[in-house]
Amino acid sequence: MPQRSQPFNSYTGHSGVRGHGVAPTVLVLALGFHGTAAWADCQTAGSAVTCDASSPNPYTGTVGSGASSGNLTITVGPGARIESGNAHAISVGTGNTISLDGNAQVSNSVTTGGPGNYNAGLNTIEFEHTNTLMIGADARVAAEGTDPAAHAIAFTGRTNVVTNYGTVSSASGAAIWNQLEDNFVSNTIYNYGVIETTANGGDAVVIGSATGNGATDRGMTLYNYAGGRITGNVVLGEGDDTVRLEAGSTLTGSLDGGAAGTDVLYLEGTSGSGELTQDISNFDEINKIESGATWTLSGSLGANSSGKATVVNAYNGELIVTGDNSAAAAGSAMTVWGGARLQVNTTSAMAAIQSNGSGVAAFSQQTDGTYAGVLSGGGNFAKEGAGSLTLTGVNTYTGALQLKEGKVIVSAAENLGAANSRLEFDGGTLNTTSDMTSARRTTIDAGGGTFEVAGGTTLNWTGRMLGNGTLVKEGAGTLALSGFNAHGGTVVNAGTVQISNDYGLGNGALTLNNSRLASTADIYAEAAATVNGNGTFDTANGTTLQWMGDIGGAGALVKTGAGTLLLGGDSLYAGGTVVNAGTVQVFKDASLGGGALTLNNASLASLGSFSTARAATLTGNGTFDTTVGTTLGWTGDIGGAGALVKTGQGTLVLGGDNQYAGGTTVNAGAVQVARDANLGAAAGAVALNDARLASTGTFSTARAATLTGNGTFDTATGTTLGWTGDIGGAGALVKTGQGT
């Protein structure tokens, strides 16, 4: 993995100036041959050239004569100034060491251009090969003229090193210019200070390279350390270029690696942050290295005139990419490595993103967006931000998709990565828009996890649900849970949750908000439940759902499906119980909550003896099934258009002033009444099918009766039952009891 370049050896030969692997520059005080001090403006003693602040200051000539001036040590002392006007200030060849001490200044102001000593313009400071330029704190190199071909510093050769703690400035040309044909070795810039152009308000080339004339290998290495500032655009040449930027540094303009060569950008730092706000182009690699620092790239990446692809690597720390990268060259991609975090959105993400190890590639999506690229690798991906992320690609990652905020929308299981990938919820939503099946293991953390299933579709989730958070179901479709789950509870706000084993709902409570729980097998549950609005329990034919926990809430409990729902808790739900299909079984009145009972071609089965004063409505036929040896006392009024049907070998005691219109059919056991009004509307008939009608009071009735099997009339001692209505049927009339 690439590592950050560390500063080399330091020394204190000049005020605040550190060296980078070069021979120390010696401050020369223009010593004479006999060692006596001879201060002047700029003087030469052997290979040493010293400029100080003595009069005349500034010095207005040129130090050096181009390629013939080599192996010199040139020192511009504190406060000294070289102002060369329409000419070079320093122009030397090979092997020179140049230093500007604190508050020194070297400048020119070229207005009438000329070829200069290297046919490269009248640059302020220029040199050929293997030179070292040290610019101390508060020192300044400036090209202050109007000629755009006159640069503040110009490389006309290779293996040169510039270290800047002061300011390098240009009013028209570049602050630093790289010009050479056949330059196979990089020139190097270490910046701790300011490198700037003031041309066009700072929106001009500040560090650049020549093009054409066969110059195809101009390489450059640029370091911008914390506190360093580069104002303007950096446009590198056609060689192999390396740019290393440390958190806390500033580059205001765009960054262009050049049309050829291998160009690499490193984003470094162990603390703090850095940001590049303008476009980055023509780089083969952009590498975020070192932990601790966060870098943000808000310009475009990879819109390369060279056509080469750009690979963005997040090796350590955090890299945030927010620009529009839709024009990135073909093959451009992003990779995040173990321990690092890459943040993108659907506009800034490149066509392929790979996450490895413990790395996380996060889509921070504040608005809705679609990503059609490919997500791969063994690492993790995350969804953050309130917006929706629609994934349409065939993704192959084997790590986790972490849903923290907003929605991830998918239409096929392969949008969620490999079949063995994972889902981790902590506040986010998975929205499925078509039928699909997934065996992915899922974790729901404290922030909860929402499954939104589109209407008319079913999401079969066979993987296990873990975690202490709550599963929330949205959408009109069906979420089928068949894993052995252990999550922290289930809230169904819309549609249906379907379970097929005792563990489908995890370890917590159930809440139904105008929604439905469907069971497809015999299931036993002890969890508490809440019904807000109608809460529907749908049980498949031939199956029983035993719900032994208490059920509360302001809503009604609605029973659908041909199967059986057994209620065993002390329930307080206020909206009543509506049985539209199948059977509800109870041991006690408290299991039916606080409201009325409605039976619509459905059954209430009592498994123990108890009495209730609740009202009941028979919208279709309503069956009361009493277990042998038990008595159900129903003293509340029973109304509705349907018939009351009695099954089971136990006894149903009716005590209300009932108005149900469909008559009374007793198919097993006994119905016991004390007065005619207990048997519903006066026009309603009674049918006995090998069953019994017991009267405990004296009364008469004109209602008809049918004995489809033997029909027993049991009259209590001391009472008389007067039956003036017609009695028909194939069965026998049997009289029991001591009454008349």
Predicted feature descriptions by range:
Residues 1-18:
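N-terminal secretory signal peptides that target proteins for export/translocation
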Residues 57-67, 86-94, 113-128, 148-157, ...:
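Glycine-rich beta-solenoid repeat tracts in large extracellular/virion proteins
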Residues 48-61, 72-86, 99-120, 131-149, ...:
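Beta-strand-rich solenoid/repeat architectures in extracellular/passenger domains
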Residues 95, 103, 129, 158, ...:
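Conserved consensus positions within extracellular tandem repeat modules
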Residues 147, 200-201, 228-230, 245-252, ...:
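Surface-exposed loop/turn positions within long extracellular repeat scaffolds
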Residues 54-56, 77-79, 95, 103, ...:
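Tight coil/turn sites that cap or link beta-strands
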Residues 52, 77, 93, 101, ...:
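Extracellular repeat turn/loop positions enriched in glycine and acidic/polar residues, especially those
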